[in-house]
Amino acid sequence: MKKIFLIISIFIFSVTSFSENVIRKKDLKKVDKIYYLKNSNVPFTGKISEGKDRFYYLDGKQDGKWIEFYKNGNIKSIINWKNGRLDGKYIIYENNGMKSTEATYKEGKENGEYFLYYSNGSYRTKGAYSMGKPIGVWEYYYENGKLTGKGQGI
């Protein structure tokens, strides 16, 4: 019986000793667009956890898929980063769970379809970008879904 207790105690101690440290945004400092743990001169690589929110850094720069939540549990944003710049899908949600903005980025610039939504889910704006420049036909809508106007990108 003592051996079992000893084995269980050692196991519990080893699991808690090697558990992941929780790091929060407030534990980081930003110097010249690079993030470091406070009291460190090494660029931070790792995951930041704040509640359900998840943020990732690689060599001191934002990296990977960041997911942020409202207090009610709904998703607030899904943002993709690469080497400290927006890269990939960029989606912002209203507190009610409806999308408010949807875009795609490449190397920190809008690149691809771009949508703005009203809180009821209907389109506010539809357009497209090519490396940060608006292109093609842009459409603008009333909240009831009726087209209010069109414009031309570059």
For the regions a language model picked out, list residue spans one by one:
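Sec-dependent N-terminal signal peptides
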Residues: 4-13
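Glycine/tyrosine- and acidic-biased, solvent-exposed loop/turn segments at the edges of beta-strands
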Residues: 14-154
